[in-house]
């Protein structure tokens, strides 16, 4: 079999952070955040695409005002940008994080660096 299949949790009601794909070329994470949850504030460790498949994401980049993005949106975040992802408005926020190239190709740590 040439292809490789990756599975992710479906219909989660609690916080989920899954690193699904971690190859030399790309990282893909699956994240579910119930209302009121957020990811730690951190710097993007690659060129990031956030693919929102359920709910509404509140995203704050650097010192900008927060912006809301809804399911069906794909949001691009450049490399080495301070970011905060929150679920303020939805019962469940579900999204994928695609990092390409793999952070190691940019001499960045595999896991993002948290910031204040």
From Swiss-Prot:
It holds the Pfam family Cupin_1. This is Uncharacterized protein MJ0764. It comes from Methanocaldococcus jannaschii (strain ATCC 43067 / DSM 2661 / JAL-1 / JCM 10045 / NBRC 100440). Signal peptide: none annotated. It comes from the Archaea. SUPFAM superfamilies: RmlC-like cupins.
